[in-house]
Amino acid sequence: MPLLSVVIPFGLSKERSYIEERVLQKAKSFQSDENIEFIFVEGYSSKDHELKNFIQANHHIYLKDINQKVFSQGRCRNLGASYAHSNVLLFLDVDCYISLNNFEKILKLIQIKNISQNINALIVLPVVYLNKEANEKLKQYDEKFWDILIQEDLFTAKNTWVKFFAPSSTSSIVINKYQFLRLGGNDENFIGHGYEDFDFFARVLKACVSFEKMPTNLSYDARNWNFFNFKGFRSWFSLLGYEACFYGIYMYHFYHIE
């Protein structure tokens, strides 16, 4: 049994050709083995493709939600979780990148925290959102330098490549599979990509974590991650990602047209 199942939801369209490129890149660069498996889950796609064969040829799992009429990230995540062989899940959106070095750290933390048996244990990843220039400039460097390059740009506040920093990614969390399913997974009533991860993350925090102090007015949405006071649900969500920061574990979100 692998230590971790990584669920990657996607759906293709002619308007967003970069999605197919990013799925191909992930299927090619990731390696499913005895420690980690990658599950690519396709929701609704309006573009024909041959990704299934490519994904399976690279020894990953491919699933298709044939019932989707419009794309749903949440339904894809739930489907991937139900087919996962590991007792530990990580959800990775196609626009997001985690280095192989950080995957190794995550696997170690999964064992140290015993997440496969401890249903309340979590790893929440901080995410650095990159600007358009970073998409091309990073390719000029060996991939093993990407972590240091981006983190140096973030820490020095040069922001050559960094668009903004979110201390907590509400979509990419490492969680016990039983706990994910027990909490009902993502609400499948959400369509497209939106607040389905906020809804689920709030349920996770209430079930798994005790807080000495809660922010005021939880229903308030600051619409960004720059906090000057402890107010709103984003300030609550942000608390969990700093642990991974201390380990040097960051996730990076590549730019795309919104």
Predicted regions and their residues:
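C-terminal catalytic/acceptor-binding lobe
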Residues: E20, G192, E196-E258
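Glycine-rich, basic loop-to-helix element that forms the pyrophosphate-binding segment
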Residues: N67-A84
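Short beta-strand-to-loop element that shapes/binds the nucleotide-sugar donor at the catalytic cleft/hinge
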Residues: I119-Q140
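N-proximal low-complexity "stem/linker" segments adjacent to membrane-targeting elements
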Residues: M1-Q25
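Short, flexible, basic/aromatic active-site loop/helix in glycosyltransferases
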Residues: D142-F165
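Short aromatic/hydrophobic "clamp" motif used to bind/position activated sugar donors
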Residues: L89
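Acidic donor-binding segment of Leloir-type glycosyltransferases
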Residues: V23-I66
